[in-house]
Structures are given as C-alpha cells and as structure tokens.
UniProtKB/Swiss-Prot annotation:
Active site positions, chain numbering: D20 (nucleophile), K61 (schiff-base intermediate with substrate)
Substrates-to-products reaction catalysed: phosphonoacetaldehyde + H2O = acetaldehyde + phosphate + H(+)
EC nos: 3.11.1.1
The protein's name: Phosphonoacetaldehyde hydrolase
Organism: Nitratidesulfovibrio vulgaris (strain DSM 19637 / Miyazaki F) (Desulfovibrio vulgaris)
Family of the protein in this entry: Belongs to the HAD-like hydrolase superfamily. PhnX family.
CC cofactor: Mg(2+)
Domain of life of the organism encoding this protein: Bacteria
C-alpha cells in the first residue's frame, strides 16, 4: 500500500475495519464477561449487580476489577465484608479469580452474532483489512480465537490488552492493528464496538467509530432473550444504549454488525467530501 503523506486531507476509501469481540462480533449481549465478574466478587463474599459488572466493560480485565472496586456502592459492600476500603491488593485478589473463570467459560461465548459472516465477506470483497481488539488477555484469546474460527470467524489481526502498555480508552490496540494491517492514515479506518470504552479508544486513535446496540453490553441480552422481549421494552433498552454510545463519541450508532456495511459507504462519502473523524 502506498504511504499517505499528510500534506492534504485524506479523501480516499475506507482501508480497514477493526472489530471488538464480545458483544460486537461474538457473544450476543456480552454475557460471558459480565457473569464472570459477578461470580469472582461472590467468591470474596461481595454481591455485585450485573449492571455494576457491565459498567467498565471493554476495559482490560484487571483494570475492569479496579474500576468496579472504585465504585462507591461496591466499595461500601467490600468494606462491610472485609473491614477496609478496597486497595490494590484486593484488585489482585479478585483478578486472580477472574482469569481462571474466564478461561473456563469463554469458549461457550464464541458464537458469532447474526450478520457477522455476511459483513466480513463484504469487507474482504472490497479489499479492506479486518482487524480486531479486545479487553481480554492473551491466555483468554488463546481459547476464544480458535473457537470463533471453528464457527467461521477469523479476522486478519487480533490484538489483545496484554500486548500494549494500557488498554482502552488508550488508542494503542488500534495503532497496533494499523501497524499489522499496514494501513495508514488512521482516518481511513473504522472501529466498531459496543461499549463506551470502544468509542473512547477509537476517538483517541483518530478513527471513525460505530456503536452497535442490540448485540451489545448495554442491552445485555442473548439473541433468544432479545427476540422474546416485547418490542417496546427492547426498543427502550436500545434507545438508552444508543444515547450512551453517542455521548461517548460514536459517529454512528446501529442495531448490529449486520447494519455496518452501509455505514462504511456513508463514511466513504464523507471522506470524499473532505470530512475527518476528529473535531476541527
């Protein structure tokens, strides 16, 4: 690929797409990690709500524990049980349970979301690179990647939080995707995710960002449960989730990955007009 020289605004096509994993590409509802965090805290005698477990979703998993323990509600319960406010040793203690629990359960949450295969085919049919990144660690991805591949999903690049100095909201995983895909500039890339952390990461990387809601963390429903929920209730959940992603900086918000290729075409039209993904 010919290097882009930044003496002008980039007005070419989208060159690559970077997908989040749980809640975006696989694991409808981001159910796997949410359940693990609830269970890990329970092992330490502290009950946490699923909503509390979901709040920092998208973060590197140790940081996820740290952010949960920093919540006033969780910290108060921790103090009531353990007699002290949470500190770094407590982060380590909870995380020591998170890692094996994730490794035990992650394979069951490798099912691609509806529409992923068709989206991947269209992206590759256009010659775009297909990257991915995740708050999961290296050992977790050693389980998840082959399980997803067995079900038909194999991105060109996989970057996990263990490979970079800091996970989301820092942009390093997106930059590493760009390096491995050989793609530049960053505004020729689109990040698709389902969490606030995804949106912040992409914005910090100077990428276009697309939020997905129906399959994502904030709606938090399996494919079956989403189909069974009364339409007005599901729509209300999705409206709240969409607003949260927009507030976090999403350029576009859609129901799921199945709706994302039309967004890529819309982004290309904006690029051709000289638009950029970052504020002036």
């Amino acid at each position: 690929m010919k290097p882009f020289l930044r003496t002008r605004v980039y007005d070419g096509p989208v060159r690559a797409v970077v997908l989040d994993w749980a809640g975006t590409a696989v694991d409808h509802g981001c159910l796997g990690p949410a359940a693990v965090f609830v269970q890990a805290f329970a092992l330490h005698g502290v009950e946490v709500a699923v909503s509390e477990a979901r709040e920092p979703m998208g973060s590197e998993k140790r940081e996820h524990v740290r952010r949960m323990l920093a919540m006033d509600s969780v910290a108060a319960r921790w103090r009531a049980v353990h007699g002290h406010v949470p500190h770094e040793a407590d982060v380590d203690a909870v995380y020591r349970d998170v890692e094996p629990l994730m490794l035990q359960t992650i394979a069951a949450h490798a099912v691609p979301v509806p529409g992923l295969a068709e989206f991947v085919d269209r992206v590759r049919g256009r010659g775009m690179g297909l990257g991915s990144c995740t708050g999961y660690t290296g050992p977790m991805m050693e389980v998840l990647v082959p399980e997803a591949a067995r079900r038909g999903y194999s991105p060109d690049v996989v970057v996990h939080a263990s490979e970079v100095p800091a996970g989301r909201p820092y942009p390093w995983m997106c930059y590493l995707n760009a390096m491995r895909l050989g793609v530049h500039p960053m505004e020729s890339m689109v990040k698709i995710g389902d969490t606030v952390a995804d949106m912040h990461e992409a914005r910090n990387a100077g990428m276009w960002t697309v939020g997905v809601v129906r399959t994502g963390n904030d709606v938090g429903l399996s494919e079956v449960d989403a189909a069974r929920m009364p339409p007005d209730q599901l729509a209300a959940r999705m409206t709240v989730a969409a607003a949260r992603l927009r507030e976090a900086g999403a350029h576009y918000v859609v129901d799921s990955i199945a709706d994302c290729f039309s967004v890529i075409k819309a982004i290309e039209a904006r690029l051709a007009r000289g638009d950029t993904p970052y504020p002036a």
